[in-house]
Design a protein with these regions (language model features):
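S-adenosyl-L-methionine
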Residues: 1-6, 20, 42-71
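Conserved class I S-adenosyl-L-methionine
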Residues: 5-14
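Conserved SAM-binding loop of SAM-dependent methyltransferases across substrates and taxa
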Residues: 15-28
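Conserved SAM-binding motif I beta-strand of class I
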Residues: 30-35
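Conserved SAM/SAH-binding beta-strand->alpha-helix loop
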Residues: 37-39
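Class I S-adenosyl-L-methionine
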Residues: 66-72, 84-225
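Short SAM/SAH-binding signature in class I
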Residues: 72-80
Length: 225
């Protein structure tokens, strides 16, 4: 979801695989790879050297985006950490985040908190997709500074676990993702019922997820006709 970048910042780069991929695929001219772990940065440097890309990769020991100037990176990637942490990283250096042409985020969890932060702080989601890795579906969000896009009339204003763009794009992993959300809440509901309680909030979420599944199925059906 990054392309044509002059300088990309890979935040929490770990061993540098994303940084190197951006360079190898021509998606970025240069990359600043940062992490709070010196050993991880050393491995990122070794990988770049092995691939002959060391002149285009700079590694920085840094907490979040603290090292970035306000106009330094035109693309930012923050992947493989919790949504709340991603939000805190963006909030700690809003000038750099706001001035970037795009920010690509892949939260491991906490998608609701991240979406709330983006909407509250006037970031516009410009693309979304789902990826399947090791049996788990992850949401990838691409955003930039700007007024949030208006929500479709059928989409609740207080929904942050999923985005309407995934419905509009007919993402093939959307229905499996919604089913996994619903089934997780069903398990929690069954556990609560064994204790003699039926939380209304859980039943409402399950009903909402079933509604989303029906909408997604109808969209796929209409596209096929």
């Amino acid at each position: 979801m990054i392309n044509g970048s002059r300088l990309s910042a890979d935040i929490g780069c770990d061993h540098g695989r994303l940084s190197v991929a951006l360079l190898q695929q021509g998606r970025a001219d240069r990359v600043i790879a940062s992490d709070i772990s010196a050993p991880s940065l050393q491995k990122a440097t070794e990988l770049a050297t092995l691939c002959g890309l060391e002149s285009r990769l700079t590694t920085v020991l840094s907490d979040g985006m603290a090292h970035l100037g306000p106009d330094e990176a035109d693309a930012i990637a923050i992947c493989g950490m919790g949504g709340e942490l991603i939000a805190r990283i963006l909030e700690a250096n809003l000038p750099a985040a706001k001035n970037a042409r795009c920010i690509t985020m892949q939260p491991m969890r906490g998608i609701e908190e991240l979406r709330q932060f983006l909407r509250k702080n006037e970031f516009r989601i410009i693309d979304e997709r789902l990826v399947l890795d090791a049996g788990r579906i992850y949401q990838i969000i691409r955003a930039k500074s700007g007024d949030p896009a208006p929500l479709p009339g059928w989409f609740p204003q207080d929904e942050y676990s999923i985005g309407p763009m995934l419905f509009e794009k007919r993402d093939p992993l959307l229905i499996p993702l919604l089913e996994s959300y619903r089934d997780g809440h069903l398990r929690r509901l069954e556990k609560a019922r064994r204790k003699g309680v039926t939380p209304k909030a859980l039943t409402e979420i399950i009903d909402r997820m079933n509604g989303y599944i029906n909408i997604a199925q109808e969209m796929h059906k209409n596209e096929a006709e």
